[in-house]
């Protein structure tokens, strides 16, 4: 299932919406200058996790691994709600570290690294700041060719391994299965089923799939969780789209040209219309982006427009970087070069909207009119969402079914039971209790594929014992070396997780496991104890 998360304008990144959190603390409650934060002291590490998610088992396993290796006490600390954990993170009252991670918004190494570790980034919860790291990201952003950018990203990750403001744990696969009625089912680079390609021999050819109730209206600029996003990706089409492997393909755009990664000219293909017959023009994008960026509109996806000139987090301001040339052409000026800007334009925050959206955004969000391969027929809250093929769709995705009906669930156990009974055609997850057996139960109908999803520990580097000094680096490296990732992935997750080699994900173009310094991810009890002893010689934990 996809855990929904509502965030503020400067809030948690979209890609992290599915994650629980954990805390490692060496400070007593109320001690030091940080004040009364979460965690326990007297040399004990607390591993906090949100107990409204499936995190208890792995948290216990990590505690056990670290405690055994370092000879210290590390205990799980359940926190009732994800929102409570999130509040403590944003207020920086966690006395140590917490689990974090990233699920890619779009297939770019830059999306992982900028969002989570660049100085001042909205999801930089460790409060990490490194001029060397930031400069390498800037060089990558200004690179004229992808290979040069990949080289800078590799160097940037090497700096992260030297500092360890975060500790990568594992990559998560997309896993699930399909019914005896279904065929041609596959998952893409984000572990999302490729719904339009799926077929069903039942239900009149309509494919039944699981989803959870979207947490917000289905307005592209106001959606920040996976459930609503999946519907939007079927009802709308953007300037570009991503194929199953994350490669970029022009969709509504005929061309997106730049000579400096800062100034872009975007030309649209003629003939595109929304499902109500109104034309898709340059204004459809310009108006939608300006609406999404305006502070007073309080759109949850507003941060996607922060790179465009004129954006402000503090007051209403026009996106002056958007200029209409003619009905099929507009230009974009960014505040600074961004080599992944074109890649980002396939995200649903950048989808076009017709004029009707701005006349009554609330009504539009309840039943959006899009330009994608499907149109929304009905949304029966907490029950189902019905989509039918859109005959006006002019893009490159082939619809192989008679429609998609999302059944809205609150439990993966119910999803899996319905899958076994052929009551749904596609399930995009299974309960943790079924992980050891689902591939055997489903046989060739089981799916288990890598996804653009990484999990790790994020360390607040401003807190005592964890700062950006010799002691803090040694402690983080000791913990990193003390976690037996392979054992946890094998024994708890049965091949649905893979030990991490970096801070991104293998399904993203440009990924490499050859990053200098990533040997610190190797389980090495002796080296872990040596590093912890070095930190203890500086300051007793």
Give the label of every model feature segment.
Residues 181, 257, 293, 300-355:
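Surface-exposed binding/hinge segments that line
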Residues 28-30, 53-57, 181-182, 188-191, ...:
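Structural transition elements
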């Amino acid at each position: 299932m996809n855990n929904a998360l509502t965030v503020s304008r400067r809030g948690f990144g979209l890609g992290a919406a599915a994650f629980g959190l954990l805390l490692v603390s060496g400070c007593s409650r109320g001690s030091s200058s940080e004040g009364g934060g979460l965690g326990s002291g007297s040399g004990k590490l607390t591993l906090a996790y949100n107990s409204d998610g499936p995190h208890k088992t792995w948290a216990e396993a990590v505690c056990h691994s670290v405690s055994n290796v370092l000879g210290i006490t590390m205990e799980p600390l359940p926190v009732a709600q994800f929102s409570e954990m999130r509040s403590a993170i944003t207020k920086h009252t966690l006395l140590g570290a917490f689990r974090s991670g990233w699920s890619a918004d779009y297939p770019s190494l830059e999306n992982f690294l900028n969002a989570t570790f660049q100085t001042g980034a909205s999801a930089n919860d460790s409060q990490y700041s490194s001029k060397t790291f930031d400069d390498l990201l800037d060089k990558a952003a200004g690179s004229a060719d992808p290979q040069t950018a990949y080289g800078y990203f590799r160097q940037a990750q090497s700096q992260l391994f030297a500092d360890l403001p975060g500790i990568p744990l594992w990559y998560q696969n997309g896993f699930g299965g399909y019914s005896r009625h279904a065929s041609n089912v596959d998952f893409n680079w984000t572990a999302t089923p490729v719904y339009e390609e799926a077929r069903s021999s039942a239900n009149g050819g309509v494919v039944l799939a699981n989803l959870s109730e979207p947490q917000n209206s289905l307005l592209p600029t106001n959606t920040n969780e996976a459930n609503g996003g999946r519907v939007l990706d079927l009802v709308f089409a953007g300037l570009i789209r991503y194929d199953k492997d994350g490669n970029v393909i022009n969709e509504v755009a005929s061309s997106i040209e730049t000579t400096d990664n800062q100034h872009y000219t975007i030309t649209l293909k003629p003939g595109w219309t929304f499902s109500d017959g109104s034309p898709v023009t340059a204004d459809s994008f310009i108006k939608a982006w300006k609406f999404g960026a305006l502070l007073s509109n309080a759109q949850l996806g507003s941060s996607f427009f922060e790179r465009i000139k004129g954006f402000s987090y503090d007051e209403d301001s026009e996106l002056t970087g958007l200029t209409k040339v003619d009905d099929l052409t507009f230009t974009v000026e960014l505040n600074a070069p961004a080599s992944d800007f074109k890649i980002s334009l396939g995200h649903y925050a950048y989808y076009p909207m017709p004029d009707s959206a701005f006349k009554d955004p609330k009504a539009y969000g309840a039943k959006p009119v899009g330009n994608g391969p499907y149109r929304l027929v009905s949304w029966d809250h907490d029950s189902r969402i019905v989509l039918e093929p859109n005959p006006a769709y002019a893009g490159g995705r082939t619809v192989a079914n008679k429609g998609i009906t999302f059944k809205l669930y609150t439990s993966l156990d119910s999803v899996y039971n319905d899958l076994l009974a052929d009551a749904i055609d596609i399930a995009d997850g299974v309960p943790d209790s079924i992980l050891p057996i689902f591939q055997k139960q489903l046989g060739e109908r089981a799916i288990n594929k890598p996804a653009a999803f990484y999990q790790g520990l994020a360390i607040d580097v401003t807190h005592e014992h964890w700062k950006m000094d010799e002691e803090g680096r040694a402690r983080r490296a000791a913990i990193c070396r003390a976690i037996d990732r392979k054992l946890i992935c094998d024994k708890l997750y049965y091949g649905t997780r893979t030990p991490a080699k970096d801070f991104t994900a293998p399904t993203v173009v440009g990924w490499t496991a050859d990053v200098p310094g990533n040997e610190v991810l190797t389980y090495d009890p002796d080296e872990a104890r040596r590093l912890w002893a070095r930190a203890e010689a500086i300051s007793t934990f």
